[in-house]
A protein has these predicted regions:
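AMP-binding adenylation
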Residues: 1-142
Length: 142
C-alpha cells in the first residue's frame, strides 16, 4: 500500500493506526484493497484472477535490496526474503508470522516482526451478475 494515500484515506474515515504495519493490516484497509482487486478481477480471464492477497507490513525499499533504484521489484530477492508469506498464500492459511530485516533512515539495522493477514478475494465470474455489476461500476454505468 502507499502509506501517504492510504494513511490519508484512513484519517478521513477516523481509522486509527500507529505504524505502516498497523495500517497495512487493518481490516478496513484490507477490505479496501480486496474491493479494488475484485473490481479488476471482473475484467480478467478466470485463470489470471487474484484469489488471495496479503499487504506487506513494510514499504519495499531499494536500500534493503527489495527494489532496484528505478523501483522495479527484485523478484528473486523478494521470493527468498518473503518465502514464508508466499508459501502461506498458496497453503490456504489465514495469517502468517514473518520477521524481516529492516534498515532505518539513520543507518541502524533491526528486524520487523508482524502477523500478516491473508485475505480471500471473492470470486465473481465476469459473466455472473456480480461480475457484470463490478464491470459496470468500473465503467461508470452502474
Amino acid at each position: 500500500i502507499d502509506m501517504q494515500v492510504v494513511g490519508r484515506w484512513a484519517e478521513e474515515r477516523n481509522i486509527g493506526f500507529s505504524t505502516f504495519a498497523d495500517l497495512s493490516q487493518r481490516v478496513e484497509v484490507r477490505e479496501l484493497i480486496r474491493g479494488e482487486i475484485a473490481r479488476i478481477n471482473a475484467f480478467l480471464p478466470e485463470h489470471a484472477r487474484v484469489l488471495r492477497f496479503a499487504n506487506f507490513p513494510k514499504e519495499l525499499d531499494p536500500d534493503e535490496g527489495e527494489l532496484t533504484r528505478s523501483r522495479k521489484l527484485r523478484r528473486g530477492f523478494i521470493e527468498e526474503r518473503y518465502a514464508r508469506l508466499i508459501d502461506a498464500l498458496y497453503a490456504g492459511t489465514q495469517e502468517v508470522a514473518i520477521t524481516v530485516p529492516v534498515t532505518y533512515q539513520d543507518g541502524r539495522k533491526g528486524t520487523l516482526s508482524a502477523n500478516v493477514a491473508i485475505t480471500e478475494v471473492e470470486r465473481a465470474a465476469a459473466g455472473s451478475p456480480r461480475g457484470q455489476q463490478a464491470r459496470a461500476a468500473a465503467q461508470g454505468t452502474a
